[in-house]
Amino acid sequence: MLSIVASPPVISAVSLSKPLQSLAKAALSLSKRAKPTSPFPKTARSISVYKSPMNNLFTRLGFGSRPQPDPAASSAIAQGPDDDVPSPGQQFAQFGAGCFWGAELAYQRVPGVTKTEVGYSHGFVDNPTYEDVCSETTGHNEIVRVQYDPKEVSFESLLDVFWKRHDPTTLNRQGNDVGTRYRSGIYFYTDEQEKLAREAMEKQQKILNRKIVTEILPATKFYRAENYHQQYLAKGGRMGLSQSAEKGCNDPIRCYG
């Protein structure tokens, strides 16, 4: 038996009524329009992530090198010599031994030390604030500047305090304090200070099992820290528990915020 399958009728625009013809043309026109494109490349995320230098994880964890100066932002003043003058018959020395609160108290207790100040040095930005230094973008170290009478206390004795106060083998770190601002450093004002510092480091290296990472460099511009940082632990700090700054005191130093 022969079966006949009828093909579906072909509908053309001609066979449509005028209203349907208009609708079909409109649909065809829409289909030919260019599809909107994303302003972001296919391989890029549509969310922009700002990467600040202060968020350099390796540097902030103490594994990276200290920030390098941007020639456009660096200051010749900041990298120049410390132009402050000690009192007559006195000498200056700068030490970086972790948090400057504890380092200052250690030197306040030394007979022959006539003045201590904490501040920022060895960076490349002029007039940094504490917040600037904490951002890890200025290159500064937390410093205690010691004024001492060389007739009463030797520079070697000040170096002894320095080595005992911190661990000179940990790069950019002292305990829980991490960052390049906590790096170990001796910053000299005279050739004699440099000579004694290097000799002392050689002796310490023979005692310690790990390599000393202390930097020994000429003292540069010293920026005095904000007043609330000065003699912080002797004044009681945030906890209001003052610690003795009496000369010769050997009480443990508790460095709390």
From Swiss-Prot:
Enzyme class: oxidoreductase
Claim: Phosphoprotein is one of the keywords in the record: yes
Pfam families: PMSR
Record's catalysed reaction(s): L-methionyl-[protein] + [thioredoxin]-disulfide + H2O = L-methionyl-(S)-S-oxide-[protein] + [thioredoxin]-dithiol; [thioredoxin]-disulfide + L-methionine + H2O = L-methionine (S)-S-oxide + [thioredoxin]-dithiol
InterPro entries linked to this entry: Met_Sox_Rdtase_MsrA_dom, Met_Sox_Rdtase_MsrA_sf, MsrA_MetSO_reductase
GO function terms (MF aspect): L-methionine:thioredoxin-disulfide S-oxidoreductase activity; peptide-methionine (S)-S-oxide reductase activity
Disulfide bond sites: none
Chain positions found as Phosphoserine: 244
Stretches for region Disordered: 61-88
Keyword annotations from UniProtKB, A to Z: Oxidoreductase, Phosphoprotein
Protein family membership: Belongs to the MsrA Met sulfoxide reductase family.
Role summary: Has an important function as a repair enzyme for proteins that have been inactivated by oxidation. Catalyzes the reversible oxidation-reduction of methionine sulfoxide in proteins to methionine.
Alphabetized PANTHER family for the sequence: MITOCHONDRIAL PEPTIDE METHIONINE SULFOXIDE REDUCTASE
Protein name: Peptide methionine sulfoxide reductase
